[in-house]
Each structure stands twice: as structure tokens, then as C-alpha cells.
Amino acid sequence: MKRIDIIVSQAIKDDFIEYYTELCTTEKVKCKFTMIDNVMGQGNTNPKMGDAIWPQLNTLFIIFCDDNMPEKISKLMARLNKEYIGEGAAAFVSDVEELG
């Protein structure tokens, strides 16, 4: 099992949800995620701090999935970054084990 943490600018949050839903439909898997809004931080683009200087914020998606999904989500992220240059979208994958 894999955990994928996806951080996107709130400006493209709805597009990520749309693309992820399309992917889940294509792969015939249930579209599951946890979404955390108002995430502050700085990556490869301008800071997203939700203040007067850096007003934008990020959204964090946490997805637990089968081992074959990270490669497909990687392609989804490449699509987002190509369409929205400079907005900020990154994904990180790790191995996880369900407890209980």
C-alpha cells in the first residue's frame, strides 16, 4: 500500500479533484482522499502564506492506494504542472502498512 501526499495551490484544487476523479473512473477504483485546506508553505514557487504579502494558500490531499496508482498520479501531476505553470503542484509517495 502507498501513501501519496499531494500539495497544490488552491487556485488549481478543483482541477486536481476533476483529474483525480477521471483517473479513478478510468481505473475502476473508488476515489478516496483526505483534503486539508489552508495549508501554508513554500516550495518551488512563490510562498503561499495566506497573508497580505503572500495571499495564496495550498491544499493538501492525502491518498492511500494500491502500489500501481503512484505512477498514474505522477502523470496526472505532470499534466497539472504543464497546464498551470508556476501555480505549484507536487506529490510525494511513501510505503505504508495499515494497522488493526
How would you name each of these model-derived features?
Residues 1-100:
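Positively charged, small/polar-rich N-terminal and surface patches that mediate targeting and assembly
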